[in-house]
């Protein structure tokens, strides 16, 4: 699962990086002649965005561990909770 997220995020990140590095050709607006500073469109450097990509494997590993620890299979092939999270809320289950 983590490798799937990693393999999907690499092409998306490289496409995003190439889109951010393309020079944009825009005609000068009237506000640039008046002296009004342009509004910052996207102020995060690419280095900070790269750290978001490194968190994807951690997120999928934590989500997988939580799912595995909450659902277990006992010897009678019925669902049970390994850590007893819902046993106190639903005593009849």
From Swiss-Prot:
**This protein's record includes keyword DNA damage:** no
Induced by what? Answer: Accumulates in cotyledons and roots after treatments with isoxaben (an herbicide) and 9-hydroxyoctadecatrienoic acid (9-HOT). Induced in leaves inoculated with Pseudomonas syringae pv tomato (Pst).
In what tissue types does this protein appear?
A: Expressed in cotyledons, roots and flowers.
Q: Name one GO cellular component term.
A: mitochondrion
Q: Where is the chain membrane-spanning?
A: none
Q: Mind listing the GO biological process terms from this record?
A: callose deposition in cell wall; cell wall repair; defense response to bacterium; defense response to fungus; lateral root formation; lipoxygenase pathway; mitochondrion distribution; oxylipin metabolic process
Q: Which UniProt keywords apply?
A: Mitochondrion, Plant defense, Transit peptide
Main location per the UniProt record:
mitochondrion
Q: Where is this gene product found?
A: Mitochondrion
Transit peptide location on this chain:
1-27
Q: Does the keyword Mitochondrion apply?
A: yes
Q: What is this protein called?
A: Protein NONRESPONDING TO OXYLIPINS 2, mitochondrial
Q: Which gene encodes it?
A: NOXY2
